[in-house]
């Protein structure tokens, strides 16, 4: 009805939960009746064994008078307290969402380091400032356990520094819930046949050992060292175990104890930004790498310190690997959805990469909270927002270009080419933007380059007038032809002195100081005109020796230029040659053929098909080569009689292996052009006359030849657009950007917006899903908290620390209300604080973690995010929650000459029971790593069901025996 699939748990968990609530409520009333009958013989002892119906004043909430209401009023009061407590739990979950967002931003901070290789080459890369293990045990654990920790501290400080049952029992109860129920759920929800293993097993061993030690330590200080009294040194040592635990976990993560005595070498990996660690004997040669001025080698003390965290082991995902993965995803999406726009492909790729990316505990906690409160799937919302921003930015840029208020005047091209015999060359001037109703004037003037005015071209200057509505004008410059062999020459044409005329101006032309606001020169404002000589058959060459092409170009076109003349028809052969790039359709398609230049034709193109592999990085080469040019219709025994006077042109015939020329009409001294055939019996050995020598020299000067660049190296590179898209996506797939906020406006919009939750089909290509009924219900239930906590500073400020500080203060305030409500709820129905804490408060504070672990178990590749942090969080709860509270209270009482007394009974019994069950839990998890199951989570259905049932049973037994001890049915310590 309410789309409850989003909150569905295992049947085992649901059954256990309902059984627990029923048993607890019945238990409380039975215990109360039994305790009353026992009171007559047991005197004051029973005061600790029964739940009191008389409430005490809370830290914030007063007592609800009268103290002895009727049965109906008790039900009403209990309902009010329970509903208020649940509503406060919702508020804590939402502010904890902000809190975890700030932690994600803080722990995602990076720093740039410089790596200097042995050859002197330097590269830059980024590393995270926070070590993953350290952040998980400090900020992450604090974020997920803040309510329990603060409840313990506030309870002690708010009740005149006396020990209470609510805080410590909540911590122990929460630990039991995390250890048994959450892990049972994670084992069960993994799809049948799939497994999840803990990747960092060393860290798990250390945190599990510290977790069990933490609760063993509580028993020792309560029942062994100083029974019933917590001394100052015990409280402080409990607190200082926290940093010691963090250091031990960090040492295990960094492998610093045993590995310190193994020589380590570091080398730069083949991929940029990657540092690879080696272990073994010390080499004889010096192969050190410097990073930030430090020589990286094992004999350098304290290199791997906490300030500079180098990701050198196998757990780190290299930036280049991430980019290649993004490139692969984009390629697959293009093939799968060829009809989609690039913005849609970016959205799909962004969501897919974010879904597959390894995520922190904070992210899963945030995701779970937002799904529960109708805030939607954070990944899909982020991907859609990024795509919309990309489209809007494109529209804005287009609009700005089209609506530019200033008219730009510029040449259509920066370079123009023409033949010497063309007569005139035309240059186009463009007017773009601004008010087209104005009249714009612009001057132009030619300037000598290697070509000279008067002998090569006609000097030209003047003014171009753009009338209202005109956007394009043409100017012409005369070109002077001659019969002299010469190099290609060029001259310049400049635009200057833009003026604007409008009806508003009195004299018709605006003053110069106002022109720039209406019209100005654009780029290019200078054009270069190259004159190709037409008195020669031509020199054939590529434009440059090397060219770079994108693999996405499809068909690449390479120009072959004909310079220093363009007379006659010439054939130029060409072919491709393999280099590191392979032909045959692997990297390019083999191409060969001939280019035929017609008379006066100065450029031809060669087309080669390049294969698009859509690689993020590519650098392969092949070559394109042109052969010796030859004239069309060659004959070895033909020649042309040349006169001393007049012009000539190529006939396509050869004399003594050289081109034969003929006279050209309409020259200075025109004569008839006649082709003369030399007799076959002509003797090649006969001495040439001086006239024939001159003819031969001229023929030699005019034959087609190869130029400087006859072999072009083609370098195939990755697509710039494709690489740019990947780089942008890589930046957008930072989870800190996904969960963080940049402004209060963004937070308030998010607070009042209802979004669709998770989809079962996960149809990434479907239309955007509408919110369900459940999403609307949860949104309206939590909208007050969402709007209230939208006032918390965005994570953009102070790199997340402003949000961190304000959020933890808000959590503390709500936790104080929860403590009072839980205590009053318990006393109203006759439950002891210890039972209320273990059952209700621990459950309420652990619900977001439960769903976070469920999502992590199904989506993550490893089990670390779902259960790996449970053990560390349990240890941190004791060391911070109980350590801080008891240290403060012990110091306060010691300063007053008193002792800080803590009853060891219920707490010590619960701790001992939890420790025994925790050993069983860890043992079962380690056994599941055997090949027949394959991992801590998942596996065959039977194994999953048995494991989940066992863990749920352990939790029920823990609750059952703790309640029996609390009500004195069994003897504790």
UniProtKB/Swiss-Prot annotation:
Residues 254-273 are annotated as: Putative calmodulin-binding region. Ca(2+) 4 binds at residues 456, 482, 486, 489. The modification Phosphoserine is found at residues 285, 392. GO terms for cellular component: axon; axon terminus; cell periphery; dendrite; intercalated disc; neuronal cell body; nucleoplasm; plasma membrane. InterPro entries: CaCA, CalX-like_sf, Calx_beta, DnaJ_domain, Na_Ca_Ex, Na_Ca_Ex_C-exten, NaCa_exhngr1, NaCa_Exmemb. The keyword Transport applies. Activated by micromolar levels of Ca(2+). It catalyses: Ca(2+)(in) + 3 Na(+)(out) = Ca(2+)(out) + 3 Na(+)(in). Residues 396-496, 527-627 form the Calx-beta domain. Residues 96-136, 192-204, 253-800, 846-874, 928-944 are cytoplasmic. Ca(2+) 2 binds at residues 420, 481-482, 534-535. Alpha- repeats lie at residues 141-181, 842-878. Ca(2+) 5 binds at residues 551, 613, 615, 718. Ca(2+) 3 binds at residues 420, 482, 484, 486, 533, 535. It is a multi-pass membrane protein. The chain crosses the membrane at residues 75-95, 137-157, 171-191, 205-225, 232-252, 801-821, 825-845, 875-895, 907-927, 945-965. Pfam families: Calx-beta, Na_Ca_ex, Na_Ca_ex_C. It is found in: Cell membrane. Keywords: Antiport, Calcium, Calcium transport, Calmodulin-binding, Cell membrane, Glycoprotein, Ion transport, Membrane, Metal-binding, Phosphoprotein, Repeat, Signal, Sodium, Sodium transport, Transmembrane, Transmembrane helix, Transport. GO terms for molecular function: ankyrin binding; calcium ion binding; calcium:sodium antiporter activity; calmodulin binding; cytoskeletal protein binding; transmembrane transporter binding. Ca(2+) 1 binds at residues 420, 456, 482, 486. The keyword Transport applies. The cytoplasmic Calx-beta domains bind the regulatory Ca(2+). The first Calx-beta domain can bind up to four Ca(2+) ions. The second domain can bind another two Ca(2+) ions that are essential for calcium-regulated ion exchange. Mediates the exchange of one Ca(2+) ion against three to four Na(+) ions across the cell membrane, and thereby contributes to the regulation of cytoplasmic Ca(2+) levels and Ca(2+)-dependent cellular processes. Contributes to Ca(2+) transport during excitation-contraction coupling in muscle. In a first phase, voltage-gated channels mediate the rapid increase of cytoplasmic Ca(2+) levels due to release of Ca(2+) stores from the endoplasmic reticulum. SLC8A1 mediates the export of Ca(2+) from the cell during the next phase, so that cytoplasmic Ca(2+) levels rapidly return to baseline. This is Sodium/calcium exchanger 1. The gene is SLC8A1.
């Amino acid at each position: 009805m309410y789309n409850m699939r989003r909150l569905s748990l295992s049947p085992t968990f649901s059954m256990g939960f309902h059984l627990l609530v029923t048993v607890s409520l019945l238990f409380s009333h039975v215990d109360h009746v039994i305790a009353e009958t026992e009171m007559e013989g047991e005197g004051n002892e029973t005061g600790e064994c029964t739940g009191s119906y008389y409430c005490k004043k809370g830290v914030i909430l007063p007592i609800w008078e009268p103290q002895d209401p009727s049965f109906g009023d008790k039900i009403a009061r209990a309902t009010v307290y329970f509903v208020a407590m649940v509503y406060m739990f919702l508020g804590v979950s939402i502010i904890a969402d902000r809190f975890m967002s700030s932690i994600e931003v803080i722990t995602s901070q990076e720093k740039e380091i410089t790596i200097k290789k042995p050859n002197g080459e330097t590269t830059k890369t980024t590393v995270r400032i926070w070590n993953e293990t350290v952040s998980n045990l400090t900020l992450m654990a604090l974020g997920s356990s803040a309510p329990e920790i603060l409840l313990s501290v506030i309870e002690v400080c708010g009740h005149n520094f006396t020990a209470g049952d609510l805080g410590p029992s909540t911590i122990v109860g929460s630990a039991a819930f995390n250890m048994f129920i959450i892990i049972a759920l994670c084992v069960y929800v993994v799809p049948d046949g799939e497994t999840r293993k803990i990747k960092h097993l060393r860290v798990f061993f250390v945190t599990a050992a510290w977790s069990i030690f933490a609760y063993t330590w509580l028993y020792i200080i309560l029942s062994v060292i100083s029974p019933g009294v917590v001394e100052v040194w015990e409280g402080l040592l409990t607190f200082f175990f926290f940093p010691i635990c963090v250091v031990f976990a960090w040492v295990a993560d960094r492998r610093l104890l045993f590995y310190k005595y193994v020589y380590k070498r570091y080398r730069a990996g083949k991929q940029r930004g990657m540092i690879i660690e080696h272990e073994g004997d010390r080499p004889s040669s010096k192969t050190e790498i410097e990073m930030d001025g430090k020589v990286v080698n094992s004999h350098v003390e304290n290199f791997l310190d906490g300030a500079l965290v180098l990701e050198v082991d196998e757990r780190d995902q290299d930036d280049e690997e991430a980019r290649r993965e993004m490139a692969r995803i984009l390629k697959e999406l293009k093939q799968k959805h060829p009809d989609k726009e690039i913005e849609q492909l970016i959205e799909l790729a962004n969501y897919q990469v974010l879904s597959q990316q390894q995520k922190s505990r904070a992210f899963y906690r945030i995701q779970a909270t937002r799904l529960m409160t109708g805030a939607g799937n954070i990944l899909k919302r982020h991907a859609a927002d990024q795509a919309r921003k990309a489209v809007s930015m494109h529209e804005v840029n287009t609009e700005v270009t089209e609506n530019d208020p200033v008219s730009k005047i510029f040449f259509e091209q920066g370079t123009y080419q023409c033949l010497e015999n063309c007569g005139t060359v035309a240059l186009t001037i463009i007017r773009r933007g601004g008010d087209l109703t104005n009249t714009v004037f612009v001057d132009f003037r030619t300037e000598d380059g290697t070509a000279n005015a008067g002998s090569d071209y006609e000097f030209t200057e003047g003014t171009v007038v753009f009338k209202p509505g005109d956007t394009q004008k043409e100017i012409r410059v005369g070109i002077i032809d001659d019969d002299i062999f010469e190099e290609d020459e060029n001259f310049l044409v400049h635009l200057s002195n833009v003026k604007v005329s409008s009806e508003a101006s009195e004299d018709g032309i605006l003053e110069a100081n106002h022109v720039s606001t209406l019209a100005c020169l654009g780029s290019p404002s200078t054009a270069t005109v190259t004159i190709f000589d037409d008195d020669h058959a031509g020199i054939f060459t590529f434009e440059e020796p090397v060219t770079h092409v994108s693999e996405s170009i499809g068909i690449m076109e390479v120009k072959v230029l004909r310079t220093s003349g363009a007379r006659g028809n010439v054939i130029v052969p060409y072919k491709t040659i393999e280099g590191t790039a392979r032909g045959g359709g692997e990297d390019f398609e083999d191409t060969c053929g001939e280019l035929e230049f017609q008379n006066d034709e100065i450029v031809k193109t060669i087309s080669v098909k390049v294969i698009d592999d859509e690689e993020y990085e590519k650098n392969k080469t092949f070559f394109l080569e042109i052969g010796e040019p030859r004239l069309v219709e060659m004959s070895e025994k033909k020649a042309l009689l040349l006169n001393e006077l007049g012009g000539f042109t190529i006939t396509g015939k050869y004399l003594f292996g050289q081109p034969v020329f003929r006279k050209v009409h309409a020259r200075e001294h025109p004569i008839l052009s006649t082709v003369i055939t030399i007799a076959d019996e002509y003797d090649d050995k006969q001495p040439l006359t001086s006239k024939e020598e001159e003819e031969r020299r001229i023929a030699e000067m005019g034959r087609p030849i190869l130029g400087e660049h006859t072999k072009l190296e083609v370098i195939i590179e990755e697509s710039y657009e494709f690489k740019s898209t990947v780089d942008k996506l890589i930046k957008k797939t930072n989870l800190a950007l996904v969960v963080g906020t940049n402004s209060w406006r963004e937070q308030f919009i998010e607070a009042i917006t209802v979004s669709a939750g998770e989809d079962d089909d996960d149809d990434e290509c479907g239309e955007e899903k509408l919110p369900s009924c459940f999403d609307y219900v949860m949104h309206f239930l939590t909208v007050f908290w969402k709007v209230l906590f939208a006032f918390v500073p965005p994570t953009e400020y102070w790199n997340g620390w402003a949000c961190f500080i304000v959020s933890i203060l808000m959590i503390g305030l709500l936790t104080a209300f929860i403590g009072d409500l839980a205590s009053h709820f318990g006393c109203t129905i006759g439950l002891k604080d210890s039972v209320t804490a273990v059952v209700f408060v621990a459950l309420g504070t652990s619900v977001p973690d439960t769903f976070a672990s469920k999502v992590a178990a199904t989506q993550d590749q490893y089990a670390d995010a779902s259960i790996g942090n449970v053990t560390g969080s349990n240890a941190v709860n004791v060391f911070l929650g109980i350590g801080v509270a008891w240290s403060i209270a012990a110091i306060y009482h010691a300063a007053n000459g008193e002792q800080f007394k803590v009853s060891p009974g219920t707490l010590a019994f619960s701790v001992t029971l939890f420790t025994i069950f925790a050993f069983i839990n860890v043992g079962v998890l380690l056994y599941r790593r055997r090949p027949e199951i394959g991992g801590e989570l998942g596996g065959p259905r039977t194994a999953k069901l048995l494991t989940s049932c066992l863990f749920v049973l352990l939790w029920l037994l823990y609750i059952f025996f703790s309640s029996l001890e609390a009500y004195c049915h069994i003897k504790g310590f």
